[in-house]
């Protein structure tokens, strides 16, 4: 489903003018450069790159303006953006990314290859009602590239086929361009357009500031498009993503703090609102490649449908994730083919060392575990196929995680070759955890390994207030809530929908054969027989 573009012809020009005025530019002298006046034919088979680049340079030489791309089909390699120049790709115009790797400029870093390339530019925009098509191609063959990981090992154990999608000609070909790459750009607006079939991350930004993505439709194949993310923000700040529909094979939106294109920088001050996301990987990912930190992120009023994973907050290189709010969401998870990460779970929090993430022995000099602190999740309705997990690290516990007004429903996936789900949600190595008005339910038929609605292990300072739910198998004495090695817990205003509501294992301090009330408190509002030790 495509959102209606919010920019229309004259509105685009007004917005571009406003952008340039904000940069101190005099609109009376703004140039308007039509690419056909510079030699573009509008025929797909012709190379439009020289003409479009000439139009960009002419606008820049005039002090800024708008490059008009009228209806037609245009094929191009790398286009270098210039400060105070906007592109208006009109309705009926399609700009194709050249399939020739030699058509892309990237200096010494192949991962900078892109159709639109801008480095150290300001006051730029890419907008309109047209289409940008990356023409990505894929091929299916037996997996002979990835090292063994959980899903692959399971498939091998089950004797299942390891056929999977690869970018065409990988690894002989090493240039897979983005549709947009921006580095250290400021005052950027990308709006209204359809971005389709990117061979790599659709939008890749490094160290950019004051960026606005508005009313975009981004699509890559949910079956095949490995690596083809939607929007990747690396060390960026003051970014707004609004009113966008993003359907991608790989992750829809990524936050990261890496050193691929320069020093690792904090990614911060980002809002995502009024969007619709679908992905064979993750809807929103706080990437494990985080070396410094990701903070002050708000995702709200967003629908995640047909996603393998809803939200993943992961750190493996020592970086931190702080001050995150995820609110007013609907999440509908499904499993995808075995080579996609995920098991149909709405939430995954994970702190590991890199060696642990790679299932390897500890490495000399590797970064210590990072941290995840102060994350609020509220007003969510989620359907899941797999277990949500909130896992800190024995050396770095999650801190200040809260769930409020959350409904979670787990359902079976009979077609899946494997199903690893156990508890609906499990948390381990965490402190100061709050669950308020959380409800968990299960669809029939229940899977034999399903267990408790909530499982808490190695937790200090747990508040469970207003929980409603049951274990998957009450006839097996499966508790609704399982506590293991939990201290400082308070349960109030909670009710179980079966006989066995809450089971405690090693949750109290034992004194003389009796459990100390200091470690666990179940208030009178908890239903009779709720605590079983």
Regions found by a protein language model. Name each.
Residues 11-23:
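Bacterial N-terminal signal peptides
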Residues 29-533:
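Extracellular/periplasmic carbohydrate-active domains that bind, remodel
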Residues 21-26, 495:
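Hydrophobic membrane-targeting signal helices
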Residues 1-8:
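N-terminal secretory signal peptides that target proteins for export/translocation
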């Amino acid at each position: 489903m495509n959102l209606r573009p919010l920019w229309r012809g004259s509105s685009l020009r007004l917005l571009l003018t406003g952008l340039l005025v904000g940069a101190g530019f005099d609109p009376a002298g703004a140039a308007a450069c039509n690419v056909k006046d510079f030699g573009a034919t509008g025929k797909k088979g012709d190379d439009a790159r020289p003409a479009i680049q000439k139009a960009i340079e002419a606008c820049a030489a005039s002090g800024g303006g708008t490059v008009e791309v009228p209806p037609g089909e245009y094929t191009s390699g790398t286009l270098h953006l210039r400060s105070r120049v906007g592109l208006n790709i009109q309705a009926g115009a399609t700009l194709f990314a050249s399939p020739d790797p030699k058509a892309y400029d990237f200096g010494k870093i192949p991962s900078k290859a892109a159709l639109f390339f801008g480095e150290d530019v300001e006051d730029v925009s890419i907008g309109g009602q047209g289409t940008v098509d990356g023409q990505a191609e894929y091929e299916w063959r037996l997996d002979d590239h990835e090292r063994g990981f959980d899903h692959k090992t399971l498939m091998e154990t089950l004797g299942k086929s390891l056929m999977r999608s690869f970018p065409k000609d990988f690894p002989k070909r090493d240039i897979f361009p983005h549709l947009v790459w921006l580095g250290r750009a400021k005052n950027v607006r990308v709006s209204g357009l359809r971005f389709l079939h990117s061979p790599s991350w659709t939008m890749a930004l490094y160290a950019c500031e004051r960026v606005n993505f508005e009313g975009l439709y981004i699509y890559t194949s949910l079956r095949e498009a490995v690596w083809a993310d939607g929007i990747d923000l690396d060390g960026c700040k003051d970014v707004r993503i609004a009113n966008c529909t993003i359907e991608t094979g790989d992750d829809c939106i990524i936050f990261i703090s890496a050193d691929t294109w320069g020093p690792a920088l904090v990614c911060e001050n980002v809002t995502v609102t009024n969007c619709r996301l679908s992905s064979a990987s993750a809807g929103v990912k706080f990437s494990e490649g985080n070396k410094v930190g990701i903070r002050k992120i708000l995702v709200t009023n967003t629908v995640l449908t047909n996603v393998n994973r809803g939200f993943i907050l992961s750190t493996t290189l020592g970086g931190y994730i702080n001050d995150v709010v995820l609110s007013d969401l609907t999440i509908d998870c499904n499993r995808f083919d075995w080579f996609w990460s995920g098991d149909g779970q709405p939430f995954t929090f994970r702190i590991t060392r890199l060696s642990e993430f790679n299932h390897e022995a500890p490495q000399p000099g590797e970064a210590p575990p990072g941290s995840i602190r102060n994350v609020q999740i509220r007003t969510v309705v989620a359907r899941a196929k797999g277990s949500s997990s909130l896992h800190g690290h024995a050396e770095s516990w999650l801190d200040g995680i809260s769930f409020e007004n959350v409904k979670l429903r787990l359902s079976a996936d009979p077609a899946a070759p494997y199903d690893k789900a156990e508890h609906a949600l499990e948390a381990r190595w965490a402190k100061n955890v709050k669950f308020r008005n959380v409800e968990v339910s299960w669809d029939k038929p229940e899977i034999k390994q399903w267990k408790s609605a909530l499982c808490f292990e190695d937790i200090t300072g747990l508040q469970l207030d207003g929980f409603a739910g049951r274990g998957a198998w009450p006839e097996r004495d499966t508790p609704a809530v399982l506590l293991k090695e939990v201290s400082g817990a308070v349960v109030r205003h909670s009710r179980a929908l079966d006989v066995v509501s809450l089971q405690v294992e090693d949750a109290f301090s034992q004194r003389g054969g009796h459990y100390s009330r200091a470690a666990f408190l179940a208030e009178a509002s908890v239903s009779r027989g709720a605590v079983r030790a």
